[in-house]
Design a protein with these regions (language model features):
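Residues at secondary-structure transition points
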Residues: 19, 36, 59, 63, ...
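PIN/NYN-family metal-dependent endoribonuclease catalytic core
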Residues: 6, 18, 22-52
Length: 137
């Protein structure tokens, strides 16, 4: 079974909109992939979903977080030894989780992360690319 990690932006898109990210979230629910997350990702997700612009209740946000905890494996992360050339240093926690979980795919909509080509341990793909890969299996 494929081992994946979803970036926070994929969770946000899956929760708020229909489309490819929601299809990937369904893959997690249906246990067709093994998904990992970290406390840092969950914290970022909670902070983002709690922003007034999304108009979501705290109860809804907590239910979402509980569901994500139920369909993912929580991992502890280690700091990156070799700092990669990332423009947004706030993305480091995503890479730390990806390396710690020993995943096959990091799924993200973040252009900075998608532009990283130096990583040989796992592939960084968009939701669309991941679903295409999954179809070809």
């Amino acid at each position: 079974m494929l081992r994946i990690l979803l970036d926070t932006n994929v969770y946000i898109s899956a929760i708020l909109f229909k489309g490819k990210p929601r299809q990937i979230l369904q893959e997690l629910v249906d246990e067709r992939v093994t998904a990992f997350t970290s406390n840092e990702i969950l914290k970022e997700l909670e902070e983002t979903l709690s922003k007034p612009k999304f108009k979501l209740t705290n109860d809804f946000v907590q239910i979402v977080l509980t569901e994500i905890r139920d369909i993912t494996k929580l991992i502890s992360t280690s700091p990156l030894k070799n700092y990669l050339d990332l423009r947004d240093r706030n993305d480091y926690h995503i890479l730390e989780a990806a390396f710690s979980a020993k995943i096959d795919y990091l799924i993200t909509g973040d252009k900075d992360l998608l532009s990283l080509k130096k990583i040989s341990e796992f592939k960084i793909v968009s939701p669309e690319e991941f679903l295409r890969i999954k179809e070809e299996e």
